């Protein structure tokens, strides 16, 4: 028994399922999860000391790589002054100014402690501002585990084969409408059915919780137009895509302007953090200036703000996103080339520092129903083959992969050579 396996058995005695977030349990791929001891650059190291090239990156935040010296130095410097104050700090102001300078649609921003808090708060604000109850989300998209959002959700709930979760009253769920991602007609149908009831659309601009699904041309702008037509707010959930797809997020990359934006992951540099922001007239509706209540004991935590600021400043380096996109393209297209070489059907998607691959004969994947038709068993075999080769991918066929600036020529070469060997063995065994 490995030390990771022993720790997993020990953890299951005191932690439900042995993990603190379901996808980590490896239910989507089988076997026991790795317990991680440390990480540096493009590598993570398990409890047995084995190194892995990491394409999870703590589920997105580690865009510069693990244990980056500038972020580590910023955290250590902040710790010298104390861990938490429950009062305003200059760091919060600096972080707000930095976010606003990078995302033109954000005129004011409120810091919170997680992505779920950000989306939950943004939806409450949208409902309060419009005085409407219903929200519209998309099948296969995930926006955290708030009751109103865990309705036909993707991500962990989808991996577990549960389209929604017990514990959510029907009275909550009835206010959440679900449309088809990349299908404007399904959105318009719902708005025509409830023309004055829908407060907002919330969307992942690149769906990263049904693997990686970019928007088709015109889709995001079409949503913007429908919101304007019916008087609803548009919320772009950039918890995953914010500052990972481009310096101004997916909204900048695709040229669409939302009313509200949610952020997380990258803006914390690896620390727990979230944020929501947008139009000033909407943001002024939040307490203490407005009637919509939102609060948090650790919101704007100085350690998280310090780590996030260091990362955000580093992301302003010229040419960084072009280099990151080139790395991502190489990995995604390298996987596809290896699969083609060995006669294994595969489709790929990638944008910015995100990528996805699908074992399928479908030529392209643009919708949730297509994702569910992919070969999950082939993914599981490939996953464990890559793990044995020292490559750590997301342990679910429904999660995106992430590149970092720390992934260099050597790491990419080793990854693609490993993929070639694993796919060759899969073909030989078929």
From Swiss-Prot:
Entry annotated with the keyword Cytoplasm: yes
Primary location group: cytoplasm
Keyword vocabulary terms for this entry: Cytoplasm, Isomerase, Porphyrin biosynthesis, Pyridoxal phosphate
Cofactor(s) named in the record: pyridoxal 5'-phosphate
BP-aspect Gene Ontology terms: protoporphyrinogen IX biosynthetic process
Entries under InterPro entries matching the protein: 4pyrrol_synth_GluAld_NH2Trfase (IPR004639), Aminotrans_3 (IPR005814), Aminotrans_3_PPA_site (IPR049704), PyrdxlP-dep_Trfase (IPR015424), PyrdxlP-dep_Trfase_major (IPR015421), PyrdxlP-dep_Trfase_small (IPR015422)
Domain of life: Bacteria
Pathway: Porphyrin-containing compound metabolism; protoporphyrin-IX biosynthesis; 5-aminolevulinate from L-glutamyl-tRNA(Glu): step 2/2
Catalytic activity: (S)-4-amino-5-oxopentanoate = 5-aminolevulinate
GO annotations of cellular component type: cytoplasm
Gene Ontology MF: a single term: pyridoxal phosphate binding
Positions where N6-(pyridoxal phosphate)lysine occurs in the chain: 265
The keyword Phosphoprotein belongs to this UniProt entry's keyword annotation: no
Principal EC category: isomerase
UniProt subcellular location: Cytoplasm
Pfam family, one: Aminotran_3
Gene3D superfamilies xrefs: Aspartate Aminotransferase, domain 1, Type I PLP-dependent aspartate aminotransferase-like (Major domain)
PROSITE patterns: AA_TRANSFER_CLASS_3
EC code(s) of this entry: 5.4.3.8
Family to which this protein belongs: Belongs to the class-III pyridoxal-phosphate-dependent aminotransferase family. HemL subfamily.
Subunit description: Homodimer.
Name of the molecule in the record: Glutamate-1-semialdehyde 2,1-aminomutase
Species the sequence originates in: Shewanella baltica (strain OS185)
